């Protein structure tokens, strides 16, 4: 899924011009990390350099790469509601829901060359009748949380292991709850395992504020520089 907002960012010439300097700034800040984390910092520097090399190789524009993969049949790129609007909250204003869908479809086609066939509904949230608006925009399939299918009436014969078709002809795939658990669970999944990086700890919280200001960063915030592993806490 490539959301409409992300498409707009990826197509913005100024942001593309600022990306390589942004990567270089992060590499420079990594040089000031605590020496205890030198190995993690060095590994992250290599990753940032690889990202810079790839960005240069595609001419500073990622969209043609995505477009080529889609046209080759390697990817089936889908969209999302234009501003990630939570559609059940907008159901009393069908015009607003339609605007979310049609804007997303048009922007996807304009920037990627093809109309999307599928959509990732924000928060996998569905309400009765939404499928008619989706079909009107040419959207043929989407995905729901497992209970979105398991609590359907009638209950699907194969549960989440086969798509169901709505009255408007839109197919819905269910997300397997058991497969979701390892990804999201802090107690049983990847987020709680010590071999994975701690998402919430960031070099932006650890460097002196004066150094951040020298780099043009006016306030403490995450910089995308994660050097700590997950602990048992």
Map each language-model feature to its residues.
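Active-site cores of enzymes that catalyze phosphoryl transfer or operate on phosphate-rich substrates
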Residues: 24-91, 153-233
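Aromatic- and acidic-residue-enriched segments that line the glycan-binding/catalytic groove
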Residues: 6-27, 190-194
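Short, solvent-exposed turn/loop segments enriched in Gly/Ser/Thr/Pro and often Arg
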Residues: 1-4, 81-83, 118-127
